[in-house]
């Protein structure tokens, strides 16, 4: 009996041990110095290492659809029963099955194991050390400190989905993936606007939540967030007490998820039994999806079956290789560059609609059709027009052309006619023949041409002989020069090994890719930039550097290897290089939205929304923080300005020209401020002989941030309100005046900060789509960045923390910002001189007395620094 009892006890212990071991691989908490990979946990829990307490959600490194043979893995949170991914971190940078997720006291990082220790994704700088990582019952990943206070949570950084209990706040968006097997950011997104939920394709609105037949508008209060509830979908206001727009769904406590699908639809699904059931989908008409039939594809909806069919408009055919509708005529083509000169327009006919005409205003009213065409012809980004006959309104289609929609039985849409912009190809027409009588002219022509041909042949032979002699003389000189050690021309790139060197291009390759450097898209102190296309149709930007200070190929390659090894989502990637003689060429990835300077200041395109500006500011700060503290070697950019902040898809900012200051020679470096046109962004220490540190970049970033807030250059014409307080025998009177003229915006921002009037600083084109608190946040960060003393400026890592809320906002120190008053005074004086010459108008502002206003220093070095840091 005793032995039987001991045997049962042993079996029970083994069973408990088995349960413990099997559950140990998936737990609710993990702690710092924890490393996970798909390979490590694939056998015990199919890649999961975190499991919520209710066992509804799991977290780990997974591949789309749970395919373990996939080459792309993502650190994700997944609904266990349905397999739905509700959040992923490294969606644009998948790792292999051996890639790791590392938890340290500094946060989470995802690393491609075996390739580099540079993370492909990481959490931002945190306010305090991490003590644990938790997966909640709602599917929220939390980083907790020693007091169990949340330092970071995945719900604040949604990807394409939100679930019960999660809030998608005003200005935040869900970005659909490229496809269901590719989690990379696609072209569609769902954005929470101030009055509605908006769906966008490549930044263009194409649908609103309240357009759905099941949507009910309950109030007109400004929207604060979108939420998924047990009873449906709702846009909420007034701290969650008022519903603005609601979509009622059957009450259920089951798992419910709202997702921006890769198909371009916004879908709400519920897990019922064993499957996900779609409860809501918008838009209901598939032909309202901008790219449902590809570029210029014509979508036709069958009302009976609710299925759409795709075709091409009349006089166009499908290019099967590219999936694009192109003209049938071989003499016509879609314009591929701004160089097209011979422009034609193909009429699409009546009843053909385009989504953007429902969401944008016409550029002009009361125009004849030819004038509408002329506007498009002069606009490089214009791809076509839609013309409304009754109102004679002109709508432009810019940047991207999506699918067309065939409209049936809708008289108001039959008034709109579309036209596609086309290029007329040049034909090599033969010159008209000579209509000779009797053929007697041939001997005459021969008698004239033969002596001339002989004469020119002798000249050509003489030139060839002279060139051969010149080449021989040049070769002998080159042989002497090449033998000198340290010469940039000497040595072959293969004679020494430098790890991390990017791809080397031949000069002829780049010459062909750029069509002999035909299309210049930029220029600056480092040289000109040209657009090019590689044989695989990858777009590139080629930068020519003609004056450099390097003395040998090995030194050049070492610097290029350092730049080429830098990988960050907010830094322009160096794809390769070419060295030919004294000429250096750098090959970068191409940014399709150009520079921030053109997007923000040109006024031609749509206005950057506040959330887009915030994202650009945050992304730029992250890129600079990585250069300053994330690289093996600290890199000071030295030239932070809107022209060097490029915008990729979805206006993702990428910093260019980093690391290039070492390639300048001493002569060009001494002309740094004038040659590169950056006066107004450079910190005062550039001229005062103080040490240059990464804080010089912080100053430049602060100036750029102020321009993001106002939407104009820091020195520009604008309206300004001035409050003046007068004291006459203890009778106080206050007046407010509004004047227009040249304004030095940093000084204006300082004045408005002291008075707490932040809304006067925001870009008026936003028309109130920004709150005072949002404007205050950016202005305070910017003013902290432009402190005169470098030691008082925050690091870029601290700036990122202030943006993300993990670090309290800094307080600008007035005593370190009084130099802006001196700059403003000098600017006003110079502007008045110009105004007297009839060149510009200036304005003098009343200034209220401030107790902390100190006298401006006017030493020689201080005034000299104004020439660099002051308004340009």
From Swiss-Prot:
Q: What is its EC number?
A: 2.7.11.1
- Signal peptide segment: 1-26
Topological relation to the membrane, as annotated = Single-pass type I membrane protein
Q: What is this protein identified as?
A: G-type lectin S-receptor-like serine/threonine-protein kinase At5g35370
Localisation per UniProt entry: Cell membrane
The record lists the membrane-crossing segments as 444-464
Q: Which InterPro entries match?
A: Bulb-type_lectin_dom, Bulb-type_lectin_dom_sf, Kinase-like_dom_sf, Prot_kinase_dom, Protein_kinase_ATP_BS, Ser/Thr_kinase_AS, SRK-like_kinase
GO cellular component terms, alphabetically, are:
plasma membrane
- Its source organism is Arabidopsis thaliana (Mouse-ear cress)
Cytoplasmic side of membrane: 465-872
């Amino acid at each position: 009996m005793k032995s039987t009892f001991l045997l049962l006890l042993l079996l029970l212990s083994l069973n408990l041990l088995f349960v413990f071991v099997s559950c140990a691989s998936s737990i609710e908490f993990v702690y710092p110095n924890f490393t996970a990979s798909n390979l490590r946990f694939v056998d015990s829990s199919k890649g999961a290492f975190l499991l919520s307490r209710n066992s509804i959600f799991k977290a780990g490194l997974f591949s789309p659809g749970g395919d373990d043979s996939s080459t792309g893995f993502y650190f994700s949170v997944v609904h266990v029963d349905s397999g739905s991914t509700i959040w992923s971190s490294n969606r644009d940078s998948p790792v292999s099955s051996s890639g790791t997720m590392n938890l340290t006291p500094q946060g989470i990082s995802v690393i491609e194991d075996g390739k580099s220790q540079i993370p492909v994704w990481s959490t931002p700088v945190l306010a305090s050390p991490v003590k644990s990582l938790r997966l909640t019952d709602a599917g929220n990943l939390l980083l907790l400190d020693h007091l169990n206070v949340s330092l970071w949570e995945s719900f604040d950084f949604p990807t394409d989905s939100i679930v019960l209990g999660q809030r998608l706040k005003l200005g935040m968006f869900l970005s659909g993936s490229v496809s269901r097997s590719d989690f990379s950011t696609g072209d569609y997104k769902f954005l929470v606007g101030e009055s509605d939920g908006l769906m966008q394709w490549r930044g263009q609105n194409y649908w609103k939540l309240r357009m759905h037949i099941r949507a009910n508008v309950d109030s007109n209060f400004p929207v604060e967030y979108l939420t998924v509830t047990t009873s449906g979908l709702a846009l909420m206001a007034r701290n969650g007490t008022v519903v603005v727009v609601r979509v009622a769904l059957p009450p259920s406590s089951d798992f419910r998820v709202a997702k921006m699908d890769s198909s371009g639809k916004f879908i709400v699904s519920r897990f019922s039994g064993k499957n996900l059931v779609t409860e809501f989908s918008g838009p209901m008409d598939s032909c309202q999806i901008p790219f449902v039939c590809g570029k210029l594809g014509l979508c036709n909806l069958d009302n009976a079956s609710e299925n759409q069919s795709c075709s091409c408009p009349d006089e166009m055919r499908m290019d099967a290789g590219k999936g694009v509708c192109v003209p049938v005529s071989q003499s016509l083509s879609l314009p591929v560059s701004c160089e097209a000169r011979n422009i034609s327009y193909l009429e699409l006919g009546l009843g053909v609609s385009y989504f953007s005409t429902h969401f944008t205003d016409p550029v002009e009213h009361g125009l004849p059709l030819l004038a509408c065409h002329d506007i498009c012809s002069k606009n490089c980004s214009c791809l076509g027009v839609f013309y409304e006959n009754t109102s004679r309104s002109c709508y432009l289609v810019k940047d991207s052309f999506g699918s067309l929609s065939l409209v049936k039985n809708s008289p108001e849409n039959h008034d709109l006619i579309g036209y596609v912009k086309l290029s007329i190809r040049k034909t090599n027409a033969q010159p008209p023949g000579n209509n000779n009588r009797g053929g007697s002219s041939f001997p005459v022509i021969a008698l004239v041409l033969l002596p001339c041909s002989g004469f020119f042949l002798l000249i050509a032979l003489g030139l060839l002989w002279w060139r051969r002699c010149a080449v021989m003389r040049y070769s002998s000189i080159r042989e002497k020069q090449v033998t000198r050690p340290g010469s940039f021309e000497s040595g072959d790139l293969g004679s020494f090994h430098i790890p991390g060197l990017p791809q080397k291009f031949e000069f002829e390759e780049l010459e062909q890719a750029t069509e002999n450097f035909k299309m210049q898209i930029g220029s600056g102190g480092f040289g000109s930039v040209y657009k090019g296309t590689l044989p695989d149709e990858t777009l590139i930007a080629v930068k020519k550097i003609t004056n450099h200070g390097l003395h040998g190929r090995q030194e050049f390659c070492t610097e290029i290897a350092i730049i080429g090894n830098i990988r960050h989502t907010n830094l322009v990637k160096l794809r390769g290089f070419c060295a030919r003689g004294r000429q250096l060429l750098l090959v970068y990835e191409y940014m399709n939205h150009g520079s921030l300077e053109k997007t923000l200041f040109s006024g031609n395109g749509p206005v950057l929304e506040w959330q887009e500006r915030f994202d650009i500011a945050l992304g730029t700060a992250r890129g600079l923080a990585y250069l300053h503290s994330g690289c093996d070697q600290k890199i000071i950019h030295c030239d932070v300005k809107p022209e060097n902040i490029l915008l990729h898809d979805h206006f993702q900012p990428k910093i260019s020209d980093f690391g290039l200051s070492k390639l300048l020679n001493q002569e060009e470096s001494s002309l740094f401020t004038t040659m590169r046109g950056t006066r107004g962004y450079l910190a005062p220490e550039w001229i005062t002989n103080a040490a240059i540190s990464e804080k010089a970049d912080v100053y430049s970033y602060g100036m750029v941030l102020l321009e993001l807030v106002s939407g104009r250059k820091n020195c520009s014409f604008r309206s300004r309100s001035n409050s003046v307080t007068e004291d006459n025998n203890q009778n106080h009177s206050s007046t407010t005046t509004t004047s227009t003229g040249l304004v030095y915006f940093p000084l204006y921002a300082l004045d408005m900060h002291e008075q707490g009037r932040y809304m006067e600083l925001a870009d008026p084109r936003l028309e109130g789509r920004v709150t005072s608190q949002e404007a205050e946040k950016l202005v305070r960060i910017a003013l902290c960045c432009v402190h005169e003393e470098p030691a008082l400026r925050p690091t870029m890592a601290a700036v990122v923390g202030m943006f993300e809320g993990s670090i309290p906002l800094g307080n600008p120190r007035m005593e370190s910002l009084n130099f802006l008053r001196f700059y403003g005074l000098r600017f006003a004086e110079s502007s008045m001189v110009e105004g007297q010459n009839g060149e510009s108008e200036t304005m003098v502002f009343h200034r209220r007395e401030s107790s902390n206003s100190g006298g401006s220093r006017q030493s020689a070095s201080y005034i000299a620094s104004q020439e660099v840091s002051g308004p340009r």
